Amino acid sequence: HFVRRRQRQMCIRDSKISDNQGKFRIYNSLLSEYGVLGFDYGYSMATPNSLTIWEAQFGDFSNGAQIMIDQYISAAEDKWKLQNGIVLLLPHGYEGQGAEHSSARVERYLQLCAKDNMFVANCSTPSNLFHLLRRQIKLSYRKPLIIFTPKSLLRHPHVVSKVKDFTDGNFKMVIDDFNIDCKQAKKLVFCSGKFYYDLYTVRENRKIDDVAIVRIEQLFPLP
């Protein structure tokens, strides 16, 4: 807060700043997903060699920018032959935040997918997310990238990567299960994102050794 009132005296934080220390300005700007995503889309269009990322506070909030997503991000290349490499980070998952703070509406984005118009991903490891962003800027062409990013994975003890996982390799569209002997596996489960860690925990707790769990990291184009 700029002005503190919950004390004996009101405190204005810049009252001790002298004239030769520069200017300090506070603006109560409009909270508009539509406006900011529109600006970032234009910025990405004007600077195709920059990695422009727009992150929603929660994935649900992207509905405030639906016009930009429907008319530009998903369709501009087909309609106007305009490529754009903007990245959308959409927090997604039932993680105790309540209504309108839980779902990035994965199904809506998949319904917009056609003719390789954009990338849609749901990464499960830090290194794979790194390589996905790296691939986005290293490609010789530009496509929008939609990434679902559960907040619970930020501090999950199992969601870690070794240094060599960042320095070596590339983005993996599919991650195989190396914890199960393929000769013993009787069932194969395909999943994506944070579901892997839920399934992995259950498998470990129940000591199941005949179920393999394969992660699909890129949802579109499907590997």
List the predicted regions and their residue ranges.
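Single conserved hydrophobic/aromatic residue that forms the stacking wall/gate
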Residues: 1-12
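Short, conserved active-site loop motifs that form the nucleotide-linked donor/cofactor pocket
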Residues: 8, 86, 118, 145, ...
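Non-transmembrane, aqueous-exposed alpha-helical and coiled segments at domain scale
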Residues: 14, 23-76, 80, 93-113, ...
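Gly-rich Lys/Arg/Thr-decorated short loops/hinges at beta-loop-alpha junctions or inter-strand turns
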Residues: 16-24, 48-53, 88-91, 113-114, ...
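Generic beta-strand/beta-sheet core signal
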Residues: 27-29, 53-54, 89-91, 121-123, ...
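Short acidic loop-to-helix transition motifs that present clustered carboxylates
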Residues: 32, 126-129, 218-222
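Active-site phosphate/pyrophosphate-binding segments
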Residues: 82, 95-195
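Generic long, charged, amphipathic alpha-helical segments
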Residues: 196, 201-223
